[in-house]
Amino acid sequence: MEVDKKFNNISIFNFNESWVNVEFDDPSSKNALSENMINELNNFLDQIERNDKIRGISFKGSNGMFCSGANLKEINEIFKASEPKDKAHKISTSIGKLLKRIQSLPQVTIMIVEGAAMAGGFGIMCAGDISIVHSKAKFSLTETMIGLTPAQISPYVIKKAGFANAKKLMITAE
């Protein structure tokens, strides 16, 4: 399949005039949600969310990895910043808005998961309408391992996995 539009961190493929495939394409970070990737996704969604001809969007990761969650290099830089609270709030809010936007799209969204869907990547999977998951795919709320709560993604995880399963995931990270 030929790339129709290549951004820095995502690639867009038109399957036909009514379906678009989005590929997270930053293998060096295991398709982490960088500020740049989030902006690219939002810019792309700006272009298609009101397009009546597009009936569906599939999301997948490149190189056998769906999405590893927030970009830890950027998170580390936030804590080194002079105003870390403001920067942390900005990235957290942008991830939250992206998840809400994916869930609210008028088009059908299908998440095709190979490899791992970690933290925010798992949240993106849960925000979609339908998930197609490879039998060897792995899921984890890795932020809980470092003492963070999965606050932005928890509504989507609870809706998709149910309260009891979501609670277990949020406590054990597995």
Where are these regions (language model features)?
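Hydrophobic/aromatic residues within transmembrane alpha-helices
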Residues: 59, 71, 124-126
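Residues at secondary-structure transition points
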Residues: 28, 32, 39, 82-93, ...
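Glycine- (often His-adjacent) and acidic-residue-rich active-site loop
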Residues: 61-97
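Crotonase-fold acyl-CoA enzyme core
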Residues: 100-174
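Nucleotide phosphate-binding site architecture
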Residues: 30-31, 73-76, 140, 167
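Conserved CoA-thioester-binding segment of acyl-CoA-metabolizing enzymes
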Residues: 1-62, 100
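A short, glycine- and basic residue-enriched loop/turn
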Residues: 27-30, 64, 69, 116, ...
